[in-house]
Structure formats: C-alpha cells, structure tokens
Amino acid sequence: MKFAILFGGNSYEHEISIVSAVVLKKVINQNLEFVFCDEERRFYHIPSEKMNSKTFSTKAYKNEKELFIKQGGFFSKGFLKENKLECECVINLIHGRDGEDGKIAALFEFYSIKFIGPRLEASVLSFNKELTKLYAKSVGVKTLDYTMLRKNQNSKEKLSFPCIIKPARLGSSIGISIVKDEKDLEYAKDVGFEFDNDLVVEEFKNNIKEYNLAGCMINDEFVFSIIEEPKKKEFLDFEQKYLSFSGHNELIEADLSEELKEKLKDSFKKIYNPLFKGALIRCDFFILDNEVYLNEINPNPGSLANYLFKDFNTTLNALADQISLEKMIKINYNFLHSINGQKGKL
C-alpha cells in the first residue's frame, strides 16, 4: 500500500511532528509521499530526498508544489488539469493541535480520504486531559485524582504538595511543572496558562512507575507492541520524549509480571475499543501498589511508536487494509420534487 505522511500543523508540537516524519521515512520500507502543513495551514508536497530539518528551518519547503484538498485526496494545479497525489492511505502524523484535536479527522472524513489516525470523537476525548479522565472512568479504567484550575477564575481548591501541573490540551511535556511547595505555585500556573486556559493538577508521586503500551485493532483482534518502561528523571521532558525515538537502540521489554502485563493490556482494550478504531495509539500508564492507572492517551504517538513494535511495517499495512470509508448518502431530491409538483410551490 502506498502511504502519504501528513505532518506539521499550526501546533506547539509542529517541530516534533517534523522529527516524527523524518524518522518514519527511515522506518517504512516502501514508497512514500510527504505532505507538509505549515503554520498557515497550507499544504506542500515535499520530495523524499528533501525530508530533512534544513528544508523546514530555512522555509525552503515554500519552493515545493503546493497542494489543496478536495473530495478524494490532495491535488496540485497543473497547466491543463488538476493532478491528484497518488496514495492509498494518509498517515496523520500531526501532533497536538490540528492533528489530535479533531480538525484533520473531520477534514478527511468530510472529503472521503482514507487515513490512519483517531476519528473525530476519539480526537476530542484524548486531546483534552480532563475529558480523557472522564472517558477512562466511564469504561472502567482508573486515573489519578485531579483538580482543575481555570484561567481568570479564583480557585478555592486546597492543593497538596508536591503536585504536577499540566495544560489540559497539550502534550510533549510542554508547559508542565512539578511544584514542590506553595511558593512555586503561581509561577507554575503562569507557565501553564501561557499554553491553555485549563490546567490539570495531580499529586506528584515519587514511587510511581510509568509504562507505555501501543497497539491497534486489526480485523477485531488486538495487536500490541512490547511494553516500555521509559527511562526518566522526575518526569519525561521534551528532549527525553522526542529525541529518544529518533535513535536506533533496540528496546528491551519492561520487566513485569504476567499479571501486570495483562492488566495493562486489558486497560488498553477498554480505552481503544471501539472509539479508536482506525488509529494506532499509545497509552501511557502508571502502576502504583499493583494497580493500573491511565496517565494519557497518545492518539498520534511520536513516529507512530514504531520502535515499540517487532514488525511495524506488517502491522501498519494490515491496519490500513481494513480501514473503510464512510458510506456516502445518495441524495435524490424526491421530497423537493414532490413539493415542486404541487400547487403553492416552495
């Protein structure tokens, strides 16, 4: 199957998305097309040989062919006709806003474009950490207790320290602060509110373990990656998260009991099915006192979490093969014709 990778977007995670696409180019062993969405949300067709950081940092991409989107795919303007970008399935690799908040999903569904990525409802629930917690609770998956802080509202909630403060609609550890006592609270809130009007506050637990599990559903069967235990300090910062997947070191599966592995997989299944069908996602979990808690859902994980899979290419192609487009409704205007044929026309 021929894929096009869509990356970039008007997002704080724009550059991360570029890194993801460059890494994935080295991983997918078949012919690829690359569609870059710049900060103005204009699409460009990037030749494979120009998929490098310089193309984007110098804005040389603007010299490439501009694309537009319409029913059935991406097109460029030719001398006499429009030329369709040849691909069978688009991989949504835009991180954060645009790619994970539902905009791209809605656009692709509206224009009947086959794609790998979260659909609209899944995007909405996974992009907002508060909604993610409510969704997890509804399907029987635990999350850590939390408090919400709203911009321009004086919260009367008494916070416990240390705590961790996160923007509700941002990933990649951007805007996150660990607050060890009250004197650091206002600064952490100011940092968070630079990125979002809503902040999630959780108690920071030193003895907690974090594990990542990626997967998808193919023909009603789950395909899982290995379970990863991230190497970290207090929490994963920007560079730990997004430079780590650009390396080539072979990962070793986390040393966990079979009971805990099954608990993680069971929680993943509850989160994934049926909302995330058509997407390859990564769930980040906490384990505390032998209990599993969902930390967050990554609906478009960095480089699609390829490094966690033993046979990523087979998984990706099998996932794409079973994705179907929404059935179009045929409009015949019979009702309007019937009105038109009567006295007192509409």
Swiss-Prot record:
This is D-alanine--D-alanine ligase. InterPro entries: ATP-grasp (IPR011761), ATP_grasp_subdomain_1 (IPR013815), D-Ala_lig_Van_CS (IPR000291), D_ala_D_ala (IPR005905), Dala_Dala_lig_C (IPR011095), Dala_Dala_lig_N (IPR011127), PreATP-grasp_dom_sf (IPR016185). Mg(2+) 1 binds at residues 284, 296. Pathway: Cell wall biogenesis; peptidoglycan biosynthesis. It is found in: Cytoplasm. Belongs to the D-alanine--D-alanine ligase family. Its main location: cytoplasm. Cell wall formation. The gene is ddl. It comes from Campylobacter jejuni subsp. jejuni serotype O:6 (strain 81116 / NCTC 11828).
